[in-house]
Amino acid sequence: MKKVIAIDMDQVLADLLSDWVAYINTYDDPFLKEKDILCWDIKKYTNTNNNVYRHLDYDLFRNLNVIEGSQRVTKELMKKYEVYVVTTATNHPDSLKAKLEWLTEYFPFIPHSNVVLCGNKNIIKADIMIDDGIHNLESFEGMKILFDAPHNRNENRFIRVMNWEEIERKLL
């Protein structure tokens, strides 16, 4: 039986942060930079406060760039593991359709039955989780792989990977 890997979508497969920051900067001042975001709560770095989340809409999620190497390595992982994409989507209902369409376009080799759209990842049971969110890995019981991002740079409790090539070396 294959081991199960749960892979986060935003900031692991899809480059949410750069597009979100660019979108926020069209409405907000001062000019926000990705490297300046040192914690999960992006609203601490903007003048829009809670309204920063209004930018998490269909168009943003549908048009994200693919993280380099993620398609090729995910396809290789599927030969050895049962791969699921697990993404928090129910907190932003406009993202549900967009995320599924995005995955269908850029990761057509992942069946829809292996896509989990949820609100809280603490229900996920797998052998390995790859995520950029510290809070998602804290409650996970398997191997915890932290995908590097500006907001998690001070974290050292998990296996850190800088890119998909490192995931390939560790898991294949």
From Swiss-Prot:
The catalytic activity of this protein is classed by the Enzyme Commission as 3.1.3.-
Active site positions: 8, 10
Enzyme class label? hydrolase
UniProt protein name: 5'(3')-deoxyribonucleotidase
Q: Which UniProt keywords apply?
A: Hydrolase, Magnesium, Metal-binding
Task: Provide the function of this protein.
Answer: Dephosphorylates nucleoside monophosphates such as the 5' and 2'(3')-phosphates of deoxyribonucleotides in vitro. Also catalyzes the dephosphorylation of coenzyme A (CoA), pyridoxal-5'-phosphate (PLP), riboflavine-5-phosphate (FMN) and nicotinamide adenine dinucleotide phosphate (NADP) in vitro.
Q: Which family does it belong to?
A: Belongs to the 5'(3')-deoxyribonucleotidase family.
Q: Which GO terms describe its molecular function?
A: 5'-nucleotidase activity; metal ion binding
Please list the GO biological process terms of this entry: pyrimidine deoxyribonucleotide catabolic process
Gene3D superfamilies under this entry? Answer: Deoxyribonucleotidase, domain 2 (1.10.40.40), HAD superfamily/HAD-like (3.40.50.1000)
Concerning Pfam families, the annotation shows: NT5C
